[in-house]
């Protein structure tokens, strides 16, 4: 039995390895749905809940990034997680991992909505008063 040259064996290993990686990449690309496709397949109730909670998730992500920046800027060791309680530490067990208080967030959104409604009503009132003050009588000259 003749033995193949060393470069041939390494070339075969490279080709087989490349084909395995390329096959996996192509399968991943064409079989995994995008976020939009996945959301479109949800039932209407789940999709509505997903849309309702989108802002809260974005707020949590912003809060997490803020904490990560603070932690990175500090001189503490990397395993100290800042304000986030680690489940591996004794005082961090049995704590709620949520970064944003949902009730407080909804209350703030409601307050902002009420303020915008009041501002809009005041603007409409000013416009109406302005129209009334500009209104001319039948016999007035100007």
Swiss-Prot record:
Alphabetical keyword list: Chaperone, Coiled coil, Membrane, Mitochondrion, Mitochondrion inner membrane, Transmembrane, Transmembrane helix
Domain of life, source organism: Eukaryota
Basic and acidic residues biased stretches: 86-99
Predominant cellular place of this UniProt entry's protein: mitochondrion
Cell compartment(s), UniProt: Mitochondrion inner membrane
Record's bilayer topology term: Single-pass membrane protein
GO cellular component, as recorded: mitochondrial inner membrane
Sequence segments annotated as region (Disordered): 79-99
Coiled coil found in the keyword field: yes
GO BP term (any one): mitochondrial respiratory chain complex III assembly
Segments traversing the membrane: 10-32
Coiled coil residues, start to end: 108-137
Similarity comment: family membership: Belongs to the CBP4 family.
Function: Essential for the assembly of ubiquinol-cytochrome c reductase. It has a direct effect on the correct occurrence of the Rieske protein, core 4, core 5 and apocytochrome b.
PANTHER family in the record: ASSEMBLY FACTOR CBP4
Annotated protein name in UniProt: Assembly factor CBP4
């Amino acid at each position: 039995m003749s033995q193949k040259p060393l470069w041939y064996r390494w070339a075969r290993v490279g080709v087989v390895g490349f084909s395995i990686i390329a096959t996996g990449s192509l399968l991943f690309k064409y079989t995994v749905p995008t976020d939009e496709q996945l959301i479109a397949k949800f039932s209407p109730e789940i999709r509505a809940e997903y849309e309702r909670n989108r802002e809260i998730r974005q707020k949590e992500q912003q809060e997490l990034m803020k904490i990560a920046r603070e932690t990175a800027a500090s001189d503490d060791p990397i395993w100290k997680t800042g304000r986030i309680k680690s489940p591996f530490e004794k005082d961090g067990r049995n704590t709620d991992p949520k970064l944003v208080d949902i009730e407080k967030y909804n209350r703030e959104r409601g307050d902002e909505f009420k303020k915008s409604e009041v501002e809009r009503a005041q603007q409409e009132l000013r416009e109406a008063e302005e129209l009334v003050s500009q209104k001319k009588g039948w016999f007035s000259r100007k």
